[in-house]
């Protein structure tokens, strides 16, 4: 690969200040840029903003390291840490663009995050998921999808038969995420010929 790999950071669109997820997302942004990756996200608040803030705090950050794929038609809706805002006008359909990055890291998240996880799984992307220490939700309500899917397969299809142990890789720290990316990303670099073909 003759470019910086682009890693999607997905998750909650709003977060409580100093929550476990906000702290992790910010640390993740710093660690990714420091390790030589670019970040792509949905460009708005919550996990997206925390990851961007962390990216800007990296000692090797440079302009262009944080890409935001916005659901609306105006780039001005982007959070202040987005270097390259892409205003798609696609609403939630923009989730496919985010998911078709080189790898995807989920931090909590609701149904929008679940759609991105599903797209990434179908597209055979490397997927990492934060094991949220105290996940939200109840027996009747799914929440914090990263905690639910961590260390599991999203369905019963053998999407990458050449990769032993293929699954959503659970992580507890930003360092875990960077280490798994370094080890696993080369295995997932190929892409399906077209969407839906398995």
Show the residue positions of the predicted features.
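Structured adenosyl-cofactor binding patch, chiefly the S-adenosyl-L-methionine
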Residues: 141-154, 167-168, 173
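Acidic/glycine-enriched connector segments
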Residues: 23-26, 30-33, 41, 45-119, ...
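Generic N-terminal amphipathic, Lys/Arg-enriched alpha-helix
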Residues: 2-19, 29-30, 34-35
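Flexible, glycine/charged-enriched surface loops at secondary-structure junctions
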Residues: 42, 166, 192-194
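Short, conserved catalytic or adaptor-binding loops enriched in Gly and charged residues
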Residues: 77-79, 154-164
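Short acidic-hydrophobic, aromatic-tinged amphipathic segments that line or gate anion-handling sites
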Residues: 85-89, 164-180
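C-terminal amphipathic helix plus adjacent low-complexity
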Residues: 179-198
């Amino acid at each position: 690969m003759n470019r910086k790999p682009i890693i999607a950071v997905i998750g909650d669109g709003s977060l409580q200040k100093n929550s476990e997820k906000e702290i992790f997302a910010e640390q993740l942004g710093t660690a990714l840029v420091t390790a030589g990756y670019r970040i792509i996200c949905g460009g708005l608040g919550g996990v997206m903003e925390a990851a961007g803030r962390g990216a800007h705090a990296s000692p090797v950050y440079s302009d262009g390291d944080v890409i935001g794929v916005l659901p609306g038609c105006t780039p001005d809706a982007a959070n202040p840490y987005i270097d390259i805002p892409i205003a798609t006008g696609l609403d939630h359909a923009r989730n496919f663009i985010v998911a078709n990055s080189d790898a995807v890291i989920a931090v909590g998240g609701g149904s929008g995050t679940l759609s991105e996880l599903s797209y990434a799984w179908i597209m055979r992307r490397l997927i990492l998921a934060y094991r949220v220490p105290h996940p939200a939700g109840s027996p009747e309500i799914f929440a914090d999808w990263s905690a639910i899917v961590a260390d599991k397969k999203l369905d019963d299809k053998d999407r990458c038969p050449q990769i032993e142990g293929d699954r959503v890789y659970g992580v507890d720290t930003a360092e875990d995420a960077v280490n798994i990316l370094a080890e696993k990303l080369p295995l997932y670099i190929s892409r399906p010929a077209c969407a839906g073909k398995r």
